[in-house]
């Protein structure tokens, strides 16, 4: 049976882990790093797709084809305010497609967020496979606790496109609690997980109990903001740098994508440095140029200035904390321990603010960048049977219901209900002789239907003619362990039933997902062929170099005819390298190897002769010249 891996699909960075001999193992990627930038790039002059650090390295010179923070678009519609805000902040193109979803366009091709996220998941899959030495087909993938149904479904689609059977979607704060609590917590504790990542913020209140040797993790409540994270902090620094540069130099950098990409990298670096230093310098030579010549950016930023720039963002995290406590029917003093998760929590001001709110110093026992992946691996271990005595009870973050007469949302399942769960309610017709009812499924907390998230709708038809209010239609909601919803409607009189797994009114169809899976498989073939081509080119380069070197060393021992034949074979191989025909390169490698065989034999003969000479010399050195003394016989 193949191993189930745990993947933290982050906005800024991603991470993969497995259970290994009863312990969690974070797996290093091919670059030797424990986390991978969630960045995908499409180079201008190549069909290759770059993922992770290689994509990040070329971002400055290729900003419009370098995609980052794609998680913020997953499961979202183009017209949402959050998406409209991002359009003006990122260098790549966000577009609206026919179903209303927000996609991106790169090099003339439109792509869905799950399709792009699948590239990052694919990198995590390959990282695990390289470590394990076997194919991986199953995974547990984490999502922000406050992700709605559309975003959860889109994340599952991304896993599927990457070639994985997603065994479970698990909330990030819950995963972090697992990582923290499985080994470190004894007895019963109520903990708060404050998770401020690259693009999202979550807070969860979780009760941990030891019951007859089994650890129970029960989520009491969760809240958050799916468009608040480190990326927003970076943007505040970028905005400050742009304003200061414009004031000082009179040049607006917002219209220069390459300059903005350099500013983004500098902002992220400055933010990290200010977590351990009181001040940092942002130096960007030749950031732009005008008629007067090149312009250099040199601006000092203090920690106090950064705190001022992001003060409102920090305050935005407190309200969800208050709501989560209220929903759990607890006060801050009831919390035993606070865990910080997400790279942005390394900011000292965040730690202080959380400490002030909960009245206790946050624990630093877990790595904020790795805790979520570790928890995903533990959950994978539970599902695979490797981890015993752990029970996880998660919740649905938002209320679920249907639209009823007058545009009102009637809730069937309240937020923070433990999942899996189901609920049913009887509804009726609104007018006489109504032959069909439309079930419009909603998610959210508002009473007005229009103010909530529309998850989809379907019709139950064939209802017999009857006065309004007489037919009985039973609507049933069923949420699985991933927080994904099935809805059915049944006419109690006729027994007719209609049911669907909720897909957002947008979202990817099954056909689109299958097409993307096939595209991903095709790209996997392309990637393999590309790697094989590069290997052949490298072999050719190495052979050319060594042959030229040998020719030079043996120039006095090689005839002009031999030299001419070998040099011609070298020239032909050099020409072949300039094209991307692997077969032609391999053929020319064989030709040069064959033509250069006499050279190889000469080198071997020369080496053998030298060794023989050395051995003879050593043997001569080993002969001892003895001193003889003549002894005269006196007899």
Swiss-Prot record:
It holds the Pfam family HSP70. Residues 595-635 are annotated as: Disordered. Residues 622-635 have a biased composition (Acidic residues). It comes from Ruthia magnifica subsp. Calyptogena magnifica. Induction: By stress conditions e.g. heat shock. Residues 612-621 have a biased composition (Basic and acidic residues). InterPro entries: ATPase_NBD, Chaperone_DnaK, Heat_shock_70_CS, HSP70_C_sf, HSP70_peptide-bd_sf, Hsp_70_fam. This is Chaperone protein DnaK. One of its GO terms (molecular function) is unfolded protein binding. The modification Phosphothreonine is found at residue 200. Keywords: ATP-binding, Chaperone, Nucleotide-binding, Phosphoprotein, Stress response. Acts as a chaperone. Belongs to the heat shock protein 70 family. The gene is dnaK.
């Amino acid at each position: 049976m193949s191993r189930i891996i745990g993947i933290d699909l982050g906005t800024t960075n991603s991470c993969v882990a497995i259970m290994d001999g009863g312990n969690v193992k974070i797996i290093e990627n091919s670059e030797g790093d424990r986390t991978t930038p969630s960045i995908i790039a499409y180079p201008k002059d190549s069909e290759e797709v770059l993922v992770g650090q290689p994509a990040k390295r070329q971002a400055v010179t290729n900003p419009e084809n370098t995609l980052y923070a794609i998680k913020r678009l997953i499961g979202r519609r183009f017209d949402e305010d959050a998406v409209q805000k991002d359009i003006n902040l990122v260098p790549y193109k966000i577009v609206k497609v026919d179903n209303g979803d927000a996609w991106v366009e790169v090099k003339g091709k439109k792509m869905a967020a799950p399709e792009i996220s699948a590239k990052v998941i694919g990198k995590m899959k390959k990282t695990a496979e390289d470590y394990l030495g076997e194919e991986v087909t199953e995974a547990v993938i984490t999502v922000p606790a406050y992700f709605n149904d559309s975003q959860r479904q889109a994340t599952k689609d991304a896993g599927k496109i990457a070639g994985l059977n997603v065994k479970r979607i698990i909330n990030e704060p819950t995963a972090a609690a697992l990582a923290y609590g499985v080994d470190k917590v004894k007895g019963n504790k109520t903990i708060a997980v404050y998770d401020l990542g690259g693009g999202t913020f979550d807070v969860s209140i979780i009760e941990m109990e030891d019951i007859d040797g089994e650890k129970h993790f029960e989520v009491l409540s969760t809240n958050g903001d799916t468009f608040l994270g480190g990326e927003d902090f970076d943007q505040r620094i970028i905005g400050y740098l742009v304003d200061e540069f414009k004031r000082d130099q009179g040049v607006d950098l917002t219209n220069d994508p390459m300059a903005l990409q350099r500013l983004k990298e500098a902002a992220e670096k400055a933010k990290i440095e200010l977590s351990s230093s009181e001040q940092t310098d942002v130096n960007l030579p030749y950031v732009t140029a005008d008629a007067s010549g090149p312009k250099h950016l040199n601006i000092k930023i203090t920690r106090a200035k950064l705190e001022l720039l992001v003060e409102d963002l920090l305050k935005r995290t407190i309200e969800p904390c208050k709501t989560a406590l209220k929903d759990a029917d607890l006060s801050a003093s009831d919390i035993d321990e606070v865990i910080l998760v997400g790279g942005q929590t390394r900011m000292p001001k965040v730690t202080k603010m959380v400490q002030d709110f909960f009245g206790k110093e946050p624990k630093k026992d877990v790595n904020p960048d790795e805790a979520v992946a570790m928890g995903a691996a533990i959950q994978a271990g539970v599902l695979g049977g490797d981890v015993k005595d752990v029970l996880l009870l998660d919740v649905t973050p938002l209320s679920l219901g249907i639209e009823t007469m007058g545009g009102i949302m009637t809730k069937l399942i309240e937020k923070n209900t433990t999942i899996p769960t189901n609920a049913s309610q009887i509804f009726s017709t609104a007018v006489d002789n109504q032959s069909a009812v439309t079930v419009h499924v909603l998610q959210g907390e508002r009473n007005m239907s229009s103010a909530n998230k529309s998850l989809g709708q379907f019709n139950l038809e064939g209802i017999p003619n009857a006065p309004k209010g007489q037919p009985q239609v039973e609507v049933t909601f069923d949420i699985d362990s991933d927080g994904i919803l099935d809805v059915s409607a049944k006419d109690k009189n006729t027994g007719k039933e209609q049911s669907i797994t909720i897909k957002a009114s947008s979202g990817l169809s099954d056909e689109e997902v299958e097409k993307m899976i096939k595209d991903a498989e095709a790209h996997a073939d392309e990637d393999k062929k590309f790697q094989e081509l590069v290997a052949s080119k490298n072999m050719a380069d190495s052979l050319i170099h060594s042959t030229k070197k040998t020719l030079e060393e043996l120039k006095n021992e090689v005839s002009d005819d031999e030299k001419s034949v070998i040099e011609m074979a070298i020239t032909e191989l050099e020409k072949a390298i300039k094209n991307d025909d692997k077969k032609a390169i391999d053929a020319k490698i064989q030709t040069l190897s064959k033509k250069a065989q006499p050279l190889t034999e000469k080198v071997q003969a020369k080496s053998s002769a030298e060794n023989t000479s050395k051995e003879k010399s050593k043997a001569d050195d080993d002969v001892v010249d003895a001193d003889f003394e003549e002894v005269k016989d006196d007899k």
